[in-house]
Amino acid sequence: MNRPRVFVTGSTGCIGNHAVNLLMAEGAEVYGFSRTTSPERQTCDDYHHVSGDLTDADAIRKALDETQPTHIIHLGALQTPDCRDYPMLGLEVNVLGTGFLFRACQELKLSLERFVFASSSAVNGPRSLYGSKGVHTDDPIQPFNLYGYWKVAGEGMARAFHQ
């Protein structure tokens, strides 16, 4: 059986870095996509860094075409403080970038076994709404900041892509 080829956006971020380590430990060939031009992790047999920006549809398409992943883990996003301070950039990265990624997958007709979109608890509103019961999948969507709204948009695109 062939090793999985996993394309990870946001691969140099906190969660992305951990995901890359876990995937490599499991024997996957990982293609890390991020804005970082000189990542701390060096390219090796199991890891290949692909410099690119989620706001660049052509760069996303080219990277996916060249890597032909079997799996995609989409972790790349502008976080809450940056979405607050730079709302239009947050929209471009978190919404348009996610859309560019889904569109490229469709146009290239990638044979994906799995596409994982990382959402956020920010779509459900502040923790104070839920108390000790926590958040459940059937709870209402109540984003309380732009980051949460942008993640709701990503969830909608993920559902549409899946169908």
Kindly label every feature range from the protein language model.
Residues 4-26:
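N-terminal Rossmann NAD(P)H-binding glycine-rich loop of SDR-like oxidoreductase domains
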Residues 9, 33, 72-76, 115-121:
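SDR active-site strand-loop-helix element
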Residues 33-39, 54:
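N-terminal Rossmann-fold cofactor-binding loop
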Residues 45-56:
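Rossmann-fold cofactor-recognition segment
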Residues 54-93:
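NAD(P)H-binding glycine-rich loop region in Rossmannoid oxidoreductase-like domains
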Residues 70, 77, 88, 92-99, ...:
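Conserved internal alpha-helix in NAD(P)-dependent oxidoreductase domains
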Residues 99-146:
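Conserved Rossmann-fold NAD(P)-dependent oxidoreductase catalytic core, especially the SDR/UDP-sugar
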Residues 142-163:
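Active-site Tyr-X1-5-Lys
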